[in-house]
Design a protein with these regions (language model features):
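N-terminal small/polar loop signature for handling phosphorylated ligands or for N-terminal nucleophile
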Residues: 1-41, 135-146
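Short, contiguous clusters of charged residues that form electrostatic/catalytic patches at enzyme active sites
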Residues: 2-9, 100, 104, 127, ...
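General beta-strand structural signal in soluble alpha/beta enzymes
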Residues: 20, 44-45, 81, 151, ...
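Short glycine-rich loop/turn motifs that provide flexible caps or phosphate-binding loops at active sites
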Residues: 20-24, 50, 58, 97, ...
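Gly/Ser/Thr-rich beta-alpha loop segments that engage phosphate groups in nucleotides
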Residues: 25-27, 31, 48, 53, ...
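A glycine/threonine-rich phosphate-anchoring loop and its flanking beta-alpha core
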Residues: 36-120, 124-125
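Active-site segments that bind and position negatively charged phosphate/pyrophosphate groups
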Residues: 108, 112-181
């Protein structure tokens, strides 16, 4: 929260016309938090595979409690995917963030707001990520697999953004916030 506050103040001081977030989910989340109060458009350049760059959702952990906010001002206006920027992401973190994207897609299949189009996107995301992640763990420099993982994450984030969070995320946020996971 303090980082977001400082970021908003700095953006105001320099008269920024957008918030650029390059990195994983926490960095993308910081960009969202800055945009929430400042209404700056977000340019997101993800370097992991969870897909949060495609959602208007922000998770905040404060005093051991994880909460989420949903606001259209936090949906990045532009997302740039560049698989080259993921090449230094260790294979283990690649697999972890990709599994998070798969969890987003599975969740979209049973969410209350699920629909046939989102289900097709979720199934494609799961298929692509299930193929790409083992390739990345075997060869972390496999650019084609990393590009496929970004495609799968894009789909997964789109699913989560469309249907919102279901049981899986609610449990993870409760346990994660409570036990600092």
């Amino acid at each position: 929260i303090e980082s977001a506050r400082a970021g908003r103040e700095e953006a105001k001081r320099v008269n920024a016309d957008c918030a650029i977030a390059i990195g994983g989910g926490s960095t993308i989340g910081l960009g969202k938090a800055i945009a929430l109060d400042s209404s700056l458009p977000i340019l997101a350049i993800p370097t992991t595979y969870a897909g949060s760059e495609m959602t208007p959702i922000l998770g905040i952990t404060e005093n051991g409690i994880k909460t989420t906010l949903r606001d259209g001002r936090m949906l990045p206006k532009t997302v740039i995917y560049d698989a080259d920027l993921t090449l230094t992401l260790p294979a283990k973190l690649s697999a972890t963030s990709g599994m998070n994207a798969i969890a987003h897609s599975v969740e979209a299949l049973y969410a209350k707001e699920a629909n046939p189009i989102i289900s097709l996107m979720a199934e494609e995301s799961i298929r692509v990520l299930a193929d790409a992640l083992p390739k990345i763990t075997r060869n972390s420099q496999d650019l084609a697999a990393r590009s496929d993982a970004q495609y799968g994450a894009w789909l997964a984030g789109g699913c989560l953004g469309a249907v919102g969070m279901a049981l899986h995320h609610k449990l993870c946020h409760t346990l994660g916030g409570s036990f600092n996971l």
